[in-house]
Amino acid sequence: MWIGPNTDIYTVTHPVNAVERRKYLAKVLPVTIGNDVWLCGKVTICPGVTIGNNVVVATGSVVIRDVPDNIMVAGNPAKVAKKLDKE
């Protein structure tokens, strides 16, 4: 796996509701990253996301949903930009 500079991988989230936030509740949601993945610079991976094998995440992308195998994603939020060859 390659990780570019200023890439953030988050695993903790908090409630949006103010009353719940005051209770200091936090939820840990693991991030899973497959093989042969390239996270370019300034990528943000949000809690609970699974990134498949042979994936490229373009510079500046914010990944809020799972990414399947053999895909390049880009944007905020990250969307499929291209299908990649398996090899």
Locate predicted features.
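Beta-rich strand-turn-strand
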Residues: 40-56, 61-65
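Conserved hydrophobic/aromatic beta-strand scaffold that supports enzyme active sites
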Residues: 62-64, 72, 80
